[in-house]
């Protein structure tokens, strides 16, 4: 009787991981990577909400005064923000320092998430290839890469909010944008930042889990793997086309971002 190839074993491993995840979800308990993804998304969204709240506290009174002056004037009336120039400058300088202060605690939260992801991945790999979990070595390089990348990206959420809000306020002052329009666009900035937080959480956990799996499978002697794509709408067309194909860990396919 022929022994299954290593590629076939990897395919079976991935299939069992997916089945295990589906079973956990069906039972009402999210698979660990999904739970960790949700934690990072929530962390990023809280950073976005905290900075947005401070931005509205700083700029809200200025916008309110300008809107009161704007009421009853022609739709093309301009320069209602002009008298607020000094107040706007003070507000933006204050917000620049607050962009960093709202990210206090991000590093420790990401560190905890990375440890949980590493533990889950080690136990899952050990279970699927039937080896003691103690023999699955930790992967400090992959974890450090995950921590540094995730912390940097989540901290940049508020910094990017500050940049975008400053550009928006500068545009309003330069072009004579209606204050009502400025207020609406400032509110929209929170949604933009939260969408970025969701993208960061999903992308970082996906990459980290894939890297941990690759390193541990290679350490166990597996030289090739079978590409297995997800089934949801987020799967890129190129990745869907690769589903089921076998590749070497040392020579992965070139995919479009």
Task: List the predicted regions and their residue ranges.
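N-terminal leader/targeting and assembly helices and adjacent pre-domain segments
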Residues: 1-189
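Acidic, glycine-rich two-metal-ion catalytic cores of nucleic acid-processing enzymes
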Residues: 192-257
């Amino acid at each position: 009787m022929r022994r299954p190839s290593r590629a076939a074993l990897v395919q079976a491993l991935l299939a069992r991981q997916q089945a295990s995840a589906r079973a956990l979800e069906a039972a009402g308990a999210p698979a660990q990577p999904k739970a960790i993804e949700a934690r990072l998304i929530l962390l990023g969204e809280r950073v976005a909400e905290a900075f947005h709240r401070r931005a509205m506290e700083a700029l809200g009174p200025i916008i309110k005064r300008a809107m009161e002056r704007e009421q009853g004037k022609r739709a093309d009336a301009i320069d209602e923000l002009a008298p607020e120039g000094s107040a706007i400058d003070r507000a933006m300088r204050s917000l620049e320092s607050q962009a960093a202060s709202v990210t206090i605690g991000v590093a420790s939260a990401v560190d905890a998430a990375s440890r949980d992801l590493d533990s889950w991945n080690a136990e899952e790999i050990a279970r699927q290839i039937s080896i003691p979990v103690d023999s699955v070595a930790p992967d400090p390089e992959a974890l450090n890469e995950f921590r540094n990348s995730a912390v940097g990206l989540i901290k940049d959420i508020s910094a990017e909010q500050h940049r975008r809000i400053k550009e928006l306020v500068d545009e309003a002052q330069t072009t004579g944008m209606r204050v009502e329009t400025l207020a609406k666009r400032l509110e929209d900035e929170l949604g933009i930042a939260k969408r970025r937080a969701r993208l960061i959480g999903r992308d970082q956990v996906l990459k980290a889990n894939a890297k941990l799996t690759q390193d541990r499978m290679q350490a166990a002697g597996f030289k090739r793997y079978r590409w297995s794509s997800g089934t949801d709408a987020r799967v890129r067309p190129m990745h869907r086309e690769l589903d089921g194909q076998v590749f070497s860990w040392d020579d992965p396919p070139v995919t479009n971002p």
